[in-house]
C-alpha cells in the first residue's frame, strides 16, 4: 500500500468516510490543473470547495469537470480582466 493510499484510508477512517468514495485520480488531476492553470495556492482551496459542493449533492465528476474547464481558461480570463 502506498503512502497516499495509507493516508487516504486513515483520513477516511478518522472522518467516518467510505474510502471507496475518495476518487484520488479525479481530485489529484483537478488540483494539478488548478495549480498549473491558476496558482499553486489555489489548488487546496479548490479541492475544499469542490468537496463542499459534492457534500451538497453535486457529483464529483461534474464539479471537477466544471472547475478544470474554468482553470484551463483562467489565463485567458485574467488577461481580459475578467
Labelled PLM ranges:
Residues 1-25, 81:
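An acidic intrinsically disordered interaction segment
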Residues 17, 40, 73-77:
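A structural signal for alpha-helix termini and helix-coil/disorder junctions
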Amino acid at each position: 500500500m502506498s503512502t497516499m493510499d495509507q493516508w487516504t484510508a486513515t483520513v477516511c477512517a478518522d472522518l467516518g468516510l467510505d474510502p471507496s468514495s475518495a476518487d484520488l485520480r479525479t481530485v489529484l488531476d483537478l488540483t494539478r490543473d488548478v495549480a498549473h492553470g491558476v496558482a499553486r495556492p489555489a489548488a487546496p482551496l479548490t479541492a475544499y470547495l469542490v468537496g463542499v459542493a459534492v457534500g451538497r449533492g453535486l457529483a464529483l465528476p461534474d464539479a471537477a469537470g466544471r472547475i478544470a474547464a474554468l482553470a484551463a481558461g483562467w489565463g485567458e480570463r485574467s488577461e481580459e480582466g475578467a
